[in-house]
């Protein structure tokens, strides 16, 4: 690629003075608590975003989440409710089609003390979701508005999905994401870039599990030998899972919580072990699935308990393969044309980009603002990155509209449909 053409430069110039308006937009959105379990807040956030995206035109709709469930402390599954998702479709018959995704939910519950936005200095704000990822949604919208008002708009179609459950692994929106991924040639997701501007490259996968362990109650003093201690079995299972990193380098397992037990004089007959497994590759994932089954069988036999495993790998591993690199190279070239040196680093974190890549779609999933300390009360966004990253996305969209995505990447995406 070369420096932006005169036509591209004219579009980019429309973004140059939008910094104050974009900052005000992010601050307003951050003031709406949209924690993943705050359905009222998510509904308000969805309505607010619908009004913001409606001027783009196209078909805008609310999409109900798929059914999901969770395992309670009693070992029983119950329905788990999620908010509705926003879906915008623009020019679906265009020969070049792009999927842009973001999430309206945050990790901060309605009763979390971290609720306000604070300006730390002229270029830094602190607030819930400012980086992850309400700032990213603002970047996405600004870029789309700029390109939509340009001659380049006729060259491509796009879909936008803003889901309500990304922070809890997208159980209600995963089918919607997969359907859309199979209709397009490239995916752009607006998770925050790193403070230095680097993007996430390869990502580990992630699986969340609940092992429901049922033993046998007995009196702890009179006849403990007749009991089958579910808590002890859960501990044994946790220790077995903790060996995964040594047995399979690159794979991590985190036994996170044990629910169960009761009075001190009763052998506990129920325990729920909750754990997370993160594989680097699909081979790691298959190894983990086999190893989990083996450990569960061994613990069950050793302790005389029944173990039922719930959950699964909701985020497949996302390797930085040749298909992904072609889109990364295009982003890097666009950045260079704007004076940005864009690199990437592998990460153990996961996002909807994992799911899109699993559909065969080339995807760059950290096109949002530069920021950091996400998932904490120190979360921050660098203000100058709003315009910087909006310009990057706008140029990327214009290049995609002109057919810049290498044929091999587009063909791979189409083959997965």
Kindly give the residue locations of the regions a language model identified.
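Glycine/charged-rich beta-loop-alpha catalytic/anionic-binding loops adjacent to active sites
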Residues: 115-130, 214-218, 374
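Short coil/turn connectors at secondary-structure junctions
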Residues: 83, 94-98, 114, 121-122, ...
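Metal-dependent amide/peptide-bond hydrolase catalytic core
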Residues: 1-10, 14, 34, 51-52, ...
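Short beta-strand segments
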Residues: 100-102, 161-163, 188-191, 212-214, ...
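Acidic/histidine-rich catalytic neighborhood of metal-dependent amide-processing enzymes
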Residues: 133-204, 246, 401, 405-411, ...
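Acidic/His- and Gly-rich active-site-bordering loop/insert found
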Residues: 2-126, 149
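Acidic-glycine-rich active-site phosphate/pyrophosphate-binding loop
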Residues: 105-121, 184, 202-212, 333, ...
């Amino acid at each position: 690629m070369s420096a932006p053409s005169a036509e591209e430069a004219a579009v980019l110039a429309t973004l140059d003075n939008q910094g104050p308006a974009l900052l005000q937009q992010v601050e307003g959105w951050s003031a709406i608590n949209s924690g993943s379990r705050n359905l009222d807040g998510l509904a308000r956030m969805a309505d607010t975003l619908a009004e913001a995206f409606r001027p783009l035109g196209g078909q805008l709709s609310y999409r109900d989440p798929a059914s999901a469930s969770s395992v309670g402390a009693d070992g029983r599954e119950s329905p788990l409710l999620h908010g509705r998702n926003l879906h915008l479709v623009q020019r679906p018959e265009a020969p070049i089609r792009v999927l842009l995704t973001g999430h309206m939910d945050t990790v901060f519950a309605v009763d979390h003390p971290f609720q306000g936005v604070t300006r730390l200095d002229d270029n830094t704000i602190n607030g819930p979701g400012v980086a992850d990822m309400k700032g990213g949604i603002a970047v996405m919208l600004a870029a789309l508005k700029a390109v939509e008002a340009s001659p380049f708009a006729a060259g491509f179609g796009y879909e936008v999905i803003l889901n309500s459950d990304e922070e809890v692994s997208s159980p209600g929106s995963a089918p919607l994401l997969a359907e859309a991924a199979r209709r397009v040639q490239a995916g752009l997701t607006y998770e925050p870039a790193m403070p230095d501007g680097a993007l996430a490259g390869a990502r580990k996968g992630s699986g969340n599990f609940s092992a429901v362990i049922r033993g046998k109650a007995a009196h702890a003093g009179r006849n403990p030998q007749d009991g089958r201690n579910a808590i002890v079995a859960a501990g044994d299972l946790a220790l077995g899972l903790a060996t995964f990193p040594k047995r399979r380098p690159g794979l991590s397992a985190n036994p996170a919580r044990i629910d169960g037990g009761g009075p001190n004089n009763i052998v506990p007959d129920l325990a729920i072990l909750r754990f997370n497994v993160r594989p680097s590759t699909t081979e790691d994932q298959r190894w983990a699935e086999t190893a989990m089954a083996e450990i569960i069988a061994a613990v069950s036999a050793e302790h005389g308990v029944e173990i039922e495993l719930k959950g699964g790998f909701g985020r497949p591993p996302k390797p930085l393969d040749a298909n992904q690199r072609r889109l990364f190279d295009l982003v890097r070239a666009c950045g260079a044309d704007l004076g940005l040196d864009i690199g990437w680093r592998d990460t153990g974190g996961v996002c909807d980009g994992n799911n899109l890549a699993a559909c065969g779609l080339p995807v760059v999933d950290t096109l949002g603002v530069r920021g950091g300390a996400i998932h904490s009360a120190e979360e921050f966004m660098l203000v100058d990155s709003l315009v910087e990253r909006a310009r990057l996305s706008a140029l990327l969209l214009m290049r995609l509209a002109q057919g810049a995505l290498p044929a091999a990447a587009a063909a791979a995406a189409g083959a997965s449909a």
